């Protein structure tokens, strides 16, 4: 600044950290979606920030630090890169210029001086690539006259710093945040200086009082005032027709005991200011190359990989709610704790599908180790796992965490007690421990997936899950067929859906006795497991969208935002067909009937031990023995009638 020369101003430099872009990304994905409405942001600076303004997402806080000046801003975020590239930036400038001019003319600035700091950011967020394109506009009028410096002096040379500093501190401590950037220093008739809000300017002009326009001035170079000073001069010129203005550039800060950095300037306009539509607005920030144009920030190289993994893994799910399924309850899915009984072909497939739906808590139960035949069919295992003979459950859990580090996954290497597999004295303690672990796991999880190799291994989990009224999804494979079904809920009462065993008139027994190799291994067409596991998880997710969860009835109509909720889905690859079947719970079912559940509730482990070691106990308890007897009588009668008819003929 030199006397006789035109006053020049230092542009603001935006300072935007990764937090801002992370908040924008979350807001865009979760709330704003396709809406392109302007968003509220704010900036803050002080006398120590050296011309930098920190941009913050959201509204300006009313209880901000008294050292800071707050600028209110608008964020326009384009939905596509084409919208950003082809935008009419001239129109954007004119619109914000109109807002600024109207605020000056209608008196808003007098009441809220920080309106002179209003700014805009035009952006495009490439959320998938973590790249953010943006252009900041700190608007001012191009038609502003040249302000010629008539006088220049240190503040301390004309104003007593002691009394003034205490008044400034008191004003900044008590004034609302929107009054802090600009205020008045008025000289009274008694030659005393007092601090007053900007709205007193009209009184000063009417009474011809001596005053200074005070601006909190954040600069990098002491020779030039900051960009907001340009707007306070324009305000005084437009609103009050002032052509000669005394400026007090306050640069010392509220903690300073002196005014050694502050400057007093007297300026005069060299011409009238003509404002005609369309307004010419300046103030676009220059990019890193020093030219007018957008900046680009790439956060993929600086963000924590765990943060990147978290946001990227849920992005596709969140995008479903933009257009396709706005009511999709992702939180209910992601917060579900899932227990997978079986870590084989079905278990691996279900786990990967749960992971893709955002489930973050998966527990495996399996008693076998990874064999050389597994990796080609079971997606969570590798050749190295076979060589080391790792337990399947623990290995699968570890592999999930390698795929997604924020996953909470554990594996339990336990055996499920099974009907038809007697427990001998030496194995009672181990089997009881496994049983207690299984019971505890079922009680602490929200959803159970039955994915074991044999029918008898599904019996005990069915009993416990029914007694605890857990959501249970059952999936089983044949050679070219598969089954996915949900078990009913006790809340369905007389309309309770059946379980896996409700169509059987015999309790499950040892299915591995007297079987050849092709009957003891899972021999199935390769695609069956992939289809079955996908549908099992989709049924689980759909159930969570119904207010009644797994107690939802079966209706031939869309029951949730994701569609129908069948009871059973059976698929056949030989003719590529699907069947949806419904069946009610069987009163004499060996797994879910009332008498079985009541007995388990009473005896717990002792019931299980007796059921396993006494072959006929379960059938007698649930009434299947009587059903079988009636069937034998009916069969005998049918044979007798058939013999009689043949005699007559």
UniProtKB/Swiss-Prot annotation:
Name its GO BP terms in alphabetical order: autophagosome assembly; cellular response to nitrogen starvation; macroautophagy; mitophagy; piecemeal microautophagy of the nucleus; protein modification by small protein conjugation; protein transport
Catalytic residues, chain numbering: 521 (glycyl thioester intermediate)
Give coiled-coil spans as residue ranges. Answer: none
Q: Extract one GO cellular component term from the record.
A: phagophore assembly site
CDD domains for this protein: Apg7 (cd01486)
Q: What phenotype is described for loss of this gene?
A: Impairs atg8-processing. Sensitive to nitrogen starvation.
Where on this chain is GXGXXG motif (motif)? Answer: 342-347
Q: InterPro entries, per this entry?
A: Atg7, Atg7_N, Atg7_N_1, Atg7_N_2, ThiF/MoeB/HesA, ThiF_NAD_FAD-bd, Ubiquitin-activating_enz
Q: Where does this chain mainly localize?
A: cytoplasm
Alphabetical UniProt keywords = Autophagy, Cytoplasm, Membrane, Nucleus, Protein transport, Transport, Ubl conjugation pathway
Q: Name one GO molecular function term.
A: Atg8 activating enzyme activity
Localization per record: Cytoplasm; Nucleus; Preautophagosomal structure membrane
Q: How does it sit in the membrane?
A: Peripheral membrane protein
| Record-stated family | Belongs to the ATG7 family.
Q: What is known of its domains?
A: The GxGxxG motif is important for the function, possibly through binding with ATP.
What does this protein do, in the record's words?
Answer: E1-like activating enzyme involved in the 2 ubiquitin-like systems required for cytoplasm to vacuole transport (Cvt) and autophagy. Activates atg12 for its conjugation with atg5 and atg8 for its conjugation with phosphatidylethanolamine. Both systems are needed for the atg8 association to Cvt vesicles and autophagosomes membranes. Autophagy is essential for maintenance of amino acid levels and protein synthesis under nitrogen starvation.
How this chain assembles, per its entry, is:
Homodimer.
What name appears for this protein in its UniProt entry?
Answer: Ubiquitin-like modifier-activating enzyme atg7
């Amino acid at each position: 600044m030199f006397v006789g020369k035109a006053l020049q101003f230092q542009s603001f430099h935006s300072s935007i950290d990764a937090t801002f872009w992370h908040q924008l990304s979350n807001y865009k994905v979760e709330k704003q979606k396709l809406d392109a409405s302007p968003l509220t942001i704010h900036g803050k600076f002080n006398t120590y920030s050296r011309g930098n303004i920190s941009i913050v997402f959201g509204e300006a806080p009313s209880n901000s630090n008294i050292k800071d000046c707050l600028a209110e801003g608008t964020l326009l975020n384009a939905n596509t890169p084409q919208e950003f590239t082809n935008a009419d930036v001239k129109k954007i400038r004119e619109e914000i210029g109109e807002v600024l001019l109207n605020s000056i003319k209608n008196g808003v600035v007098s009441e809220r001086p920080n309106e002179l700091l209003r700014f805009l950011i035009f952006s495009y967020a490439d959320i998938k690539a973590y790249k953010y394109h943006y252009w900041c506009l700190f608007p001012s009028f191009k038609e502003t006259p040249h302000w010629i410096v008539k006088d220049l002096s240190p503040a301390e040379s004309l104003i007593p710093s002691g009394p003034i500093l205490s008044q400034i501190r008191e004003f900044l401590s008590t004034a609302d945040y929107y009054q802090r950037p600009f205020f008045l220093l008025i000289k009274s008739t008694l030659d005393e200086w007092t601090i007053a809000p900007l709205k007193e300017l009209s009184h000063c002009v009417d009474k011809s009082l001596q005053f200074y326009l005070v601006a909190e001035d954040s600069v990098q170079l002491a020779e030039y005032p900051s960009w907001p000073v340009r707007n306070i001069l324009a305000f005084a010129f437009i609103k009050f027709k002032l052509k000669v203005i005394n400026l007090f550039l306050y640069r010392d800060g509220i903690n300073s005991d002196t005014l050694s950095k502050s400057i007093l300037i007297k300026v005069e306009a060299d011409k009238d200011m003509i404002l005609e539509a369309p307004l010419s607005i300046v103030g676009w920030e220059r990019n890193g190359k020093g030219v007018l144009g957008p900046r680009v920030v790439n956060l993929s190289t600086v963000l924590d990989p765990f943060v990147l993994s978290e946001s990227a893994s849920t992005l596709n799910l969140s995008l479903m709610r933009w257009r396709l399924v706005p009511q999709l309850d992702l939180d209910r899915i992601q917060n579900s704790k899932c227990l997978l009984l079986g870590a084989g072909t079905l278990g691996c497939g279900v786990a990967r599908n749960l992971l893709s739906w955002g489930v973050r808590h998966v527990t495996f139960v399996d008693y076998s180790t990874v064999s050389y035949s597994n990796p080609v069919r079971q997606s969570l295992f590798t050749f190295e796992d076979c060589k080391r003979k790792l337990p399947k459950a623990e290995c699968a859990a570890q592999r999930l965490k390698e795929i997604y580090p924020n996953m909470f996954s554990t594996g339990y290497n336990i055996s499920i007690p099974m009907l038809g597999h007697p427990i001998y004295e030496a194995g009672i303690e181990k089997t009881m421990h496994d049983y207690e672990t299984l019971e505890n796991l079922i009680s602490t999880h929200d959803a159970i997936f039955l994915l074991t190799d044999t029918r008898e291994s599904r019996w005990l989990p069915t009993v416990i899950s029914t007694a605890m009224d857990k959501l249970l999804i059952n999936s089983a494979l044949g050679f070219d067929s598969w089954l996915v079904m949900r078990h009913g809920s006790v809340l369905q009462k007389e309309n309770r859906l059946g379980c896996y065993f409700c169509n059987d008139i015999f309790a499950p027994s040892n299915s591995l006795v007297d079987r050849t190799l092709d009957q003891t291994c899972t021999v199935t067409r390769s695609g069956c497991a992939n289809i079955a596991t996908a549908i099992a998880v989709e049924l689980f997710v759909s159930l969570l969208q119904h207010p009644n969860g797994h107690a939802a009835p079966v209706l031939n109509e869309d029951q949730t935002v994701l569609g129908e909720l069948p009871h059973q889905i059976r698929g056949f690859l030989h003719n590529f067909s699907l069947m949806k079947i419904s069946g009610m719970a069987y009163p004499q079912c060996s797994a879910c009937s009332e008498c079985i559940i009541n007995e388990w509730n009473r005896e717990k482990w002792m019931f299980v031990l007796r059921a396993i070691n006494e072959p006929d106990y379960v059938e007698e308890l649930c009434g299947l023995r009587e059903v079988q007897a009636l069937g034998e009588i009916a069969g005998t009668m049918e044979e007798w009638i058939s013999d009689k008819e043949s005699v007559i003929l």
